[in-house]
């Protein structure tokens, strides 16, 4: 229910988890776009949050019970909420870390989706700039909270692998499923999306890979001026540069050229004018703030139990921690968002699907990763951008493969199948990969 006319390039992970009301999403395109296009052309979707919808100025006056019903009882995904308290209960009643980890992970899933909803509601009252920044902050708040707890526990590799897994999952699994399902629904034609935007987004991902590549190369070529410290210093410097670049990127989208884009709803007839319907926010400003605080606190609480149970779950299930961090955490933690991307593709709105998949990858790689390095710096943790050779090579190859699939501006179910199969190869690789830095976990 976002309300502000924020330009595209605003696509947060959790917002696309609003599966039950995706029909109301606003689409954005250049004013000069051809009116024949049914799928919205979203220029450079990706870094902040999804497109905001138009909201009216009407402020709801809900009771506490009404607010609870709207936020908690209106979404079927919230049926998973009881798994969180159950995980906490098991923590004190049993030593089975495998079950504690699984229940914590499932319990966090609906919280991530509701965080996106509360952020949308608050954005109705803040204006486009603040609304965009809110979504930049809360877009991947679940991953950030888990990462901060892992940093506090000294589990630097878990932080690196979890963030890497989110990027890989979005680029291969989410995008692949969207292409595959959309291709099956529209099997008689090739679905199209904005080729120019996809190329720009691919370039941004390559920039992020560059930031991760040089520390790894410096480490494995043994060419550091000061062994051990040069790699960390380069990582911290590069992280600051990436954050500055990301901030400039947001400023350009939110301030410099917001008038270059106009909201657009799906066209029912090529000769008809499109229009946007104002929508009333469902909760008030203070309700949104309170719910954001409650949900963030609840995610933080569950994240502590989740991180604490990772090692035990690895031993209990006889699964490498790297596989849990790279594969299981992103898949389950972003389940609602994945469903949203698939639904958009099945409605022939591939630009939005790309915003979820590629956009979230950009946000994590250009914001979440360097942010964690800076936070680790402040905490005295030696978190760096050296994700090790195997992991960095995997990310680099993935970006190249995805860029190759996006270069034509079309998709079909076969391309989607290829991306899914690529993800299975990556998953199998991490299952048999022995992390040489296991002690850092």
UniProtKB/Swiss-Prot annotation:
Residues that span the membrane, as ranges: 70-90, 98-118, 130-150, 166-186, 198-218, 232-252, 287-307, 312-332, 355-375, 385-405, 413-433
Primary localization: membrane
Membrane topology, record value: Multi-pass membrane protein; Lipid-anchor
One Gene Ontology CC term in the entry: vacuolar membrane
Keyword Ion transport applies: yes
Region of interest called Cation selection, as start-end residue ranges on this chain: 139-174, 333-368
Membrane-side (Cytoplasmic) residue stretches: 2-69, 119-129, 187-197, 253-286, 333-354, 406-412
Sites of S-palmitoyl cysteine lipidation: 3-4
Residues covalently joined to lipid (N-myristoyl glycine): 2
UniProt entry keywords in alphabetical sequence: Antiport, Calcium, Calcium transport, Ion transport, Lipoprotein, Membrane, Myristate, Palmitate, Transmembrane, Transmembrane helix, Transport, Vacuole
Ranges facing Extracellular side: 91-97, 151-165, 219-231, 308-311, 376-384, 434-441
Molecular-function annotations in GO: calcium:proton antiporter activity
Entry keyword Metal-binding: no
Compartment(s): Vacuole membrane
PANTHER family (alphabetical): VACUOLAR CALCIUM ION TRANSPORTER, VACUOLAR CATION_PROTON EXCHANGER 5-RELATED
Function: Vacuolar cation/proton exchanger (CAX). Translocates Ca(2+) and other metal ions into vacuoles using the proton gradient formed by H(+)-ATPase and H(+)-pyrophosphatase.
Protein name, per record: Vacuolar cation/proton exchanger 5
Record organism: Arabidopsis thaliana (Mouse-ear cress)
Gene name as annotated: CAX5
């Amino acid at each position: 229910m976002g309300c502000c006319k924020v330009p595209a390039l605003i696509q947060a992970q959790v917002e696309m988890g609003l599966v039950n009301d995706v029909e109301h999403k606003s689409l954005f395109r250049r004013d000069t776009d051809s009116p024949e296009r049914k799928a919205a052309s979203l220029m450079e979707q990706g870094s902040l949050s999804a497109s905001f919808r138009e909201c009216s100025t009407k402020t709801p006056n809900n009771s506490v019970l009404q607010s609870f019903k709207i936020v908690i009882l209106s979404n079927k995904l919230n049926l998973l909420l009881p798994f969180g308290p159950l995980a906490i209960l098991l923590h004190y009643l049993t030593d089975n870390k495998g079950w504690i980890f699984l229940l914590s992970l499932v319990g966090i899933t609906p919280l991530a989706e509701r965080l996106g909803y509360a952020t949308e509601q608050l954005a109705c009252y803040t204006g486009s700039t603040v609304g965009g920044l809110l979504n930049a902050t809360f877009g991947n708040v679940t991953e950030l909270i888990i990462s901060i707890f892992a940093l506090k526990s000294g589990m630097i590799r878990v932080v690196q692998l979890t963030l890497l897994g989110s990027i890989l999952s979005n680029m291969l699994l989410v995008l692949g499923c969207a292409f595959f399902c959309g291709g099956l629904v529209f099997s008689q034609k090739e679905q199209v999306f904005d080729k120019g935007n996809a190329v720009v987004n691919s370039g941004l991902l390559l920039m992020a890979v560059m930031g991760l590549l040089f520390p790894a190369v410096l480490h494995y070529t043994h060419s550091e001026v000061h062994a051990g410290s040069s790699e960390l210093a380069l990582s911290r410097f590069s992280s600051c540069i990436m954050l500055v670049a990301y901030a400039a990127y947001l400023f350009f989208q939110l301030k410099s050229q917001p008038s270059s884009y106009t909201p657009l709803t799906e066209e029912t007839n090529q000769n008809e004018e499109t229009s946007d319907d104002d929508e009333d926010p469902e909760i008030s400003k203070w309700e949104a703030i309170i719910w954001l605080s409650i949900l963030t606190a609840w995610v933080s609480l569950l994240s502590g139990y989740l991180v604490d149970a990772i090692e035990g779950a690895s031993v209990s299930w006889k699964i490498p921690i790297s596989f849990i961090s790279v594969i299981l955490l992103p898949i389950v933690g972003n389940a609602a968002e994945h469903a949203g991307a698939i639904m958009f593709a099945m409605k022939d709105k591939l630009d939005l699907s790309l915003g979820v998949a590629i956009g979230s990858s950009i946000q994590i790689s250009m914001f979440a990763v360097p942010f964690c390095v800076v936070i680790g710096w402040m905490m005295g943790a030696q978190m760096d951008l050296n994700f090790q050779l195997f992991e960095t090579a995997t990310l680099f190859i993935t970006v190249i493969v995805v860029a190759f699939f996006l270069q034509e501006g079309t998709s079909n179910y076969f391309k989607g199948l290829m991306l899914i199969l690529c993800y299975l190869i990556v998953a199998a690789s991490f299952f048999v990969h022995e992390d040489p830095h296991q002690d850092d976990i």
